[in-house]
């Protein structure tokens, strides 16, 4: 697609805090991404390299997320650091963008959802940041697409609870709009835009690539972010499944698990 954003798209972005761009990836790019995600999901656990996270589902322990991928996959590295994805992120931010973090959320059948939250509390090292999701599979309300409350992204952090999420009582008062996606669609959203997603209640996966970009002027802080994240995870007592973490905030509503 033409990645030049129109005035109406920019107006919608400024008003709502998010914008969906259908067919952002070409059919060939979408197929490549699907194959890459299949490859990455089959990588063996290696805590010195990429970071796999797992969850308990009705079908057993399945991958929930893989992150810190860039150095280990040339195709993913090129897609995320060159061309239309960082260019579009920069256009929406109003200045050049650089990748801050990357992850694949698999959300296999029975996979857990995510409580209402904003991404910003998890990003201590940056001020100007934006998230992009790319659909690998179709995302629907039934399999756990994202839901947003528009027009709240300029109010800063909203009623945070002890887990770094939006307080559930406050979240229940908001009007949530689903944003279904087709493979290859892109969804850009402010890290202050409140969003959530339900569990996957279908028999098909809802795999999505999530990317966060920060302003290049703030520096390349990706390695610093992941070093800090690894340190924080290393401090978690992993003797009980309920204490495992897949994120620096407690928004995951599934059941983190050790790989079996």
Curated annotation (Swiss-Prot):
Binding site for 2-oxoglutarate: 107
Cofactor(s) the record lists: Fe(2+)
EC number(s) stated in the UniProt entry for this protein: 1.14.11.71
InterPro entries (alphabetical): Phytyl_CoA_dOase-like
SUPFAM superfamilies registered for this protein in UniProt: Clavaminate synthase-like
A GO molecular function held by the record: iron ion binding
Swiss-Prot/TrEMBL keywords: Dioxygenase, Iron, Metal-binding, Oxidoreductase
Organism superkingdom: Bacteria
Amino acids binding Fe cation: 117, 119, 195
Cofactor binding comment, as recorded: Binds 1 Fe(2+) ion.
Family membership noted in the UniProt record: Belongs to the PhyH family.
Function: Part of an oxidative pathway for utilization of methylphosphonic acid as a phosphate source. Catalyzes the conversion of methylphosphonic acid to hydroxymethylphosphonic acid. Is specific for the hydroxylation of methylphosphonate.
Protein name per UniProt: Methylphosphonate hydroxylase
Species, as recorded: Gimesia maris (strain ATCC 29201 / DSM 8797 / 534-30)
Gene name, Swiss-Prot/TrEMBL: phnY*
């Amino acid at each position: 697609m033409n990645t030049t954003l129109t005035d109406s798209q920019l107006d919608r972005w400024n008003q709502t805090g998010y914008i969906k761009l259908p067919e952002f990836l070409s059919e060939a790019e979408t197929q490549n991404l699907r194959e890459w995600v299949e490859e990455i999901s089959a990588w063996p656990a290696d805590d010195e390299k990429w970071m796999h996270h797992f969850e308990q589902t009705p079908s057993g322990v399945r991958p929930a997320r893989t992150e810190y991928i860039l150095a280990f996959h040339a195709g993913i590295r090129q897609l995320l650091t060159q061309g239309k994805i960082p260019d579009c992120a920069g256009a929406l931010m109003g200045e050049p963008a650089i990748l801050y973090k990357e992850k694949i959320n698999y959300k296999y059948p029975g996979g857990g959802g995510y409580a209402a939250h904003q991404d910003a509390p998890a990003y201590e090292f940056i001020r100007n940041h934006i998230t992009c999701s790319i659909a690998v599979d179709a995302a629907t309300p039934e399999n756990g697409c994202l839901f947003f409350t528009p027009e709240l992204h300029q109010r800063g952090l909203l009623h945070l609870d002890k887990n770094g999420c939006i307080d559930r009582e406050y979240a229940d008062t908001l009007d949530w709009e689903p944003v279904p996606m087709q493979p290859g669609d892109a969804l850009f959203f402010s890290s202050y835009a409140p969003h959530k997603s339900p569990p996957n209640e279908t028999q098909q996966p809802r795999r999505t690539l999530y990317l966060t970009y920060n302003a290049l002027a703030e520096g390349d802080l990706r390695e610093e972010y992941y070093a800090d994240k690894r340190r924080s995870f290393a401090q978690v007592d992993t003797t009980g499944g309920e204490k495992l973490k897949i994120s620096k905030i407690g928004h995951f509503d599934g059941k983190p698990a050790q790989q079996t």
